[in-house]
Design a protein with these regions (language model features):
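Charged/polar low-complexity intrinsically disordered segments
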Residues: 29, 151-153
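Short, conserved alpha-helix that lines the donor NDP-sugar binding/gating region
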Residues: 49, 53
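RNase H-like nuclease fold core
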Residues: 1-47, 58-60
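Short, low-complexity, intrinsically disordered N-terminal peptides in bacterial proteins
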Residues: 1, 153-154
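RNase H catalytic domain
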Residues: 11-15, 54-136, 140-142, 146, ...
């Protein structure tokens, strides 16, 4: 089974404040395949983290196709312990703004075969962090936030 690693990061200056996300898609050997940076408007750190995961799910589904994703192991790596533990089902969602984002991810996951979320140290997520900070610095609108109406654009 092929394995894809998706590094995601979201950040906010002000929390809530101007927010950005970074997504890096790599093969199982760690070779980068694609990277994305996007400005998210005004969000909290956790909302930005969730938006990055949503974008990653939507993008990998588009890149691989609906059939191939069922036979591909997808490992998300993020440096937000809270978000990774919530997505793995270990922590409750107590913030009502995060619940719809969690549900969106839950529904997107249904199309995938094996998918899991792993918390990693910030040092191992430098590239996604750099992309998120770049988006916040530039107010970059290279992509739109992941949304049901039309999906992401690059």
């Amino acid at each position: 089974m092929e394995k894809i690693i998706i590094y995601t990061d979201g950040g906010s200056r002000g929390n809530p404040g101007p927010a950005g996300m970074g997504v890096v898609i790599a093969n199982e050997k760690g070779k980068m395949m694609k990277e994305y940076s996007g400005f998210l408007g005004v969000k909290t750190n956790n909302e930005a983290e969730y938006e990055a995961v949503i974008f990653g799910l939507q993008k990998i589904k588009t890149l691989l196709g609906k059939e191939k994703i069922k036979n591909t192991e997808i490992e998300f790596r993020l440096d937000s312990e809270l978000v990774s533990r919530q997505l793995e089902g270990f922590y409750k969602i107590e913030n009502e703004k995060l619940a719809p984002l969690f549900l969106k991810i839950w529904n997107l996951k249904m199309d995938f075969g094996k998918i899991y979320f792993k918390h990693i140290p910030r040092e191992q997520n430098r590239e996604a962090d750099r992309l998120a900070n770049e988006a916040m610095d530039k107010g970059n609108e290279k992509i739109k936030p992941a949304s049901p109406a039309g999906g992401p654009k690059n």
